[in-house]
Amino acid sequence: WNSFSRVVVYRRQYLPPQLWGGSPVARGENIFFHGMTIDGAAGTAIRSFASPKDIEHLRYDITNVGYYLNRRGKACIIGVGGGKDIQSALFFGHDAVLGIEVNPIFVDLLQNEFREFAGLANRDDVTFVVDDARSFLSQSREQFSVIQMALIDTWAATGAGAFSLSENALYTVEAWQTFLSRLSEGGIFTVSRWYSAEHIGETGRVLSLGVESLLRLKVKKPADHMALITIGNVSTLLICQQPLSEADINRLRQVCEALQYQIVHVPNGLPTEPILRQILSAQSSDQLAEAVAHAELDYSPPTDDNPYFFNMLKLNHLDTALRGQEGVLSGNLRALATLLVLLIVLGVLTVATIGVPLWLAHRPTTLMQTRGFWFGALYFSLIGSAFMFVEIALIQRLNVFTGHPIYSLGILLFTLIASTGMGSFISDH
């Protein structure tokens, strides 16, 4: 346990490896690993790593397709988890690997209890940093040949769909501009997300996010700087500051043919899916906005002012969600319904536990007193609501500077409460 998560590690198992997007040609050899769950739902594993043969199966995971482009130098992993992505970078021959993890429990497990089993902390070419990835990379001037962000989120609240209403500062245009600026010449930023050919959902928004980020970096034709590869329900997007070369494109085609991945997009090969084609054809922010304006889902690129990457439901398309479509729409609809129910419950509880006792204590006898009581209650309720709205927005922004939500919460609460107290004291005098 720590202040914001619960991580459970299970006993060692000897089973076929867990791959996010496994190739059909992957060998079925068993490996030793410890399964892990975070907050009771999100899953990962700590793999045994004593020799390259122990992690050879990682070559068959689509989240690692970017490594086949033979970039060397230092790799950066956003979200260490059980160490799988660090092991992947080492397997594909990177000189050094930096792993950035916001949850200290993972780093502690890899550096102590599972130090020998995972085989990472005892290597000179592996460095761990406990920090928010965006905050760290904003302050660092280090350059990387590959930056990998594979399925970084938590499933803790997806049962009710509530996670679609959570903020995520890693999936905004400003964050991706930071990540892209930390790439060395020819470097690759690789992002893996969930995908479905019928309901493209997150993949469409990731593409939109990549296009807008490149446009803000003065790239004239973003489609030439991106490739999208899929297998099953996982997609991997590759983004470069420089256009992908003909050698890169040929290499991707060879790898995808050998591993039976599907190529959705490479330069000079736009997708057949209309919305993806329109997004990748955009050569300005206005064209991108026009391309996604009439889609049933919200594919607009999230920004720091609207960092809700996972909330893709448009209120003017509620009828589409109500028709019972699966995937993103149904999850977003559950989230909206859950939010409305919670607001109603909280409203009733607030009136029952605060409003009614105050009413009974004062018992206004005239219409004027009754109006004054309820207007006063409404006035102070609005002040409290405004206080919370400001707090939520500032915590999100402060995370980038402090590197951790716990620090942001502590600093912000102290500052707001102290300032409010001083303001009340001064106004009374």
Segments from the language model and where they lie:
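Mobile active-site "lid"/loop adjacent to the S-adenosyl-L-methionine
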Residues: 105-106, 113, 123-124, 129-131, ...
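Short alpha-helix
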Residues: 204-218
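Periplasmic/ER-lumenal interhelical loops and adjacent helix-loop junctions
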Residues: 263-337
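Conserved S-adenosyl-L-methionine
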Residues: 192, 215-232, 265
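Transmembrane alpha-helices of Major Facilitator/SLC transporters
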Residues: 345-356, 412-429
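Flexible, glycine-/basic-rich loop-and-beta segments that form/coincide
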Residues: 222, 234-290
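Class I S-adenosylmethionine
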Residues: 1-124, 306-409
